[in-house]
């Protein structure tokens, strides 16, 4: 059983380092589950804790959401060679993925968060941020496609031309923001779609600062 546990730890560590090496950020717990064949995220958390205890991964105790991958080879078993390792010293942060948005409720309320998306701290720009998965093709001309993840910096105001996530009723929408004479225009970046004109104040949840796509 100990050997089996060690093999699984190695498999997880190799997968994490492979993702960091290829993508610049580690996989989510759900992605690790799928990659190594686990059904429960709690099992993955248990194995990750073992890797932390062994010094392969490290969490920053002052930043509950941050994880730092140590600058060393992915070597759990003694018979692994250095050439099989991947290297990184970038500090990571788990950005919450928001599944739904409800008027009058904080965007990062626990019940709204469906997953986390690990990113280098410098991507987040030292600000509160969240991820939202895009549904539809209203922003394709801006390079934001259906099922992409947008990285959103929380803020309640915007400048003309900013791509924002705004709340209209109970629906979050991603559009380009324009404040005009007596209304706000939320412009889709798709020539086949009409803008949304809002005459009352709307709630801006944040500005889009990044786009991520799973191939």
Swiss-Prot record:
DNA-binding region range list: 29-49
Keywords: Autocatalytic cleavage, DNA damage, DNA repair, DNA replication, DNA-binding, Hydrolase, Repressor, SOS response, Transcription, Transcription regulation
Catalytic reaction annotation: Hydrolysis of Ala-|-Gly bond in repressor LexA
Enzyme class: hydrolase
EC number: 3.4.21.88
GO molecular function: DNA binding; serine-type endopeptidase activity
UniProt xrefs under SUPFAM superfamilies: LexA/Signal peptidase, Winged helix' DNA-binding domain
Pfam families registered for this protein in UniProt: LexA_DNA_bind, Peptidase_S24
Positions of the record's site feature: Cleavage: 103-104
Annotated InterPro entries: LexA, LexA-like, LexA/Signal_pep-like_sf, LexA_DNA-bd_dom, LexA_repressor, Peptidase_S24_LexA, Peptidase_S24_S26A/B/C, WH-like_DNA-bd_sf
Gene Ontology biological-process annotations: DNA repair; DNA replication; negative regulation of DNA-templated transcription; proteolysis; SOS response
UniProt cross-references to CDD domains, sorted A to Z: S24_LexA-like (cd06529)
Membrane-crossing segments per the record: none
Active site: 138, 175
Family listed: Belongs to the peptidase S24 family.
Function: Represses a number of genes involved in the response to DNA damage (SOS response), including recA and lexA. In the presence of single-stranded DNA, RecA interacts with LexA causing an autocatalytic cleavage which disrupts the DNA-binding part of LexA, leading to derepression of the SOS regulon and eventually DNA repair.
Subunit structure: Homodimer.
Full protein name: LexA repressor
Native source species: Ruminiclostridium cellulolyticum (strain ATCC 35319 / DSM 5812 / JCM 6584 / H10)
Organism lineage string: Bacteria, Bacillati, Bacillota, Clostridia, Eubacteriales
